[in-house]
Amino acid sequence: MMEWRDEGALLSVRRHGESSAIIEVFTAAHGRHAGVVRGGASRKIAPILQPGAQLDLTWKARLDEHMGAFTVEPLRSRTALLGDRLGLAGLNAICAMLHVTLPEREPHSTLWQESMALLDALDRPGWPPAYLRWEMRLLEETGFGLDLTRCAVTGSREDLAFVSPKTGRAVSRGAAGGWADRLFPLPLALLGQGPASAEEVRQGLAITGHFLGRELAPLLNGRPLPEARARLMELLARA
């Protein structure tokens, strides 16, 4: 019998049979993991199984490769976000992006810590810049990090103004020349310089979205990034 105990955030839930549910969670030590919750559709347990909820999880299976079953205890509910359109959109985007990005059962401890901190921040104003930084981390977890430290053409660290949509590397204003309209504008928010305006966050997310879509293309099978992320982008565009 295989067994472990861990803490995780619920990414998705679907009904299974008459009274059970299959949940997917992102855990601290076991990564993205699915399992059955017996009685998960019951009046007692169903209210606990809400996306974003932080859970104390015990997983058991006869063999490691089996889906197995979870027992769950609530640690933190995030149902307060149900009354906050932008916060709820952020939560749904985080859960959806973790689902499509992470391989099953592969630990990502640093990303887990940063994801929990971001989920905790959603009920406070001013979190979109943190979401942008989180998507940059998510991109790094795919094995493709942006290189914004120096110009890809000249090697200079000064006046970095653009990002190449091919390489993800920064380009200085002078080196861009007539190619500037084919490059992404580089917001200072991605360089960690100064407070991030709403426009800079949108520009930054256009960059991370471009590269996440490209790197995840084999997993998406021609589909775009999750609709939950697109919904968040729509709301941020109106902000």
Curated annotation (Swiss-Prot):
Alphabetized UniProt keyword annotations: DNA damage, DNA recombination, DNA repair
Encoding gene (name): recO
The organism's place on the tree of life at top rank: Bacteria
Keyword DNA damage (UniProt): yes
The name this protein goes by in its record: DNA repair protein RecO
Its biological purpose: Involved in DNA repair and RecF pathway recombination.
SUPFAM superfamilies cross-referenced by the UniProt entry: ArfGap/RecO-like zinc finger, Nucleic acid-binding proteins
Record family assignment: Belongs to the RecO family.
Transmembrane intervals: none
UniProt-listed InterPro entries: ARFGAP/RecO, DNA_rep/recomb_RecO_N, NA-bd_OB-fold, RecO, RecO_C
GO biological process terms, semicolon-separated: DNA recombination; double-strand break repair
Gene Ontology CC: bacterial nucleoid
Source organism of this protein record: Cereibacter sphaeroides (strain ATCC 17029 / ATH 2.4.9)
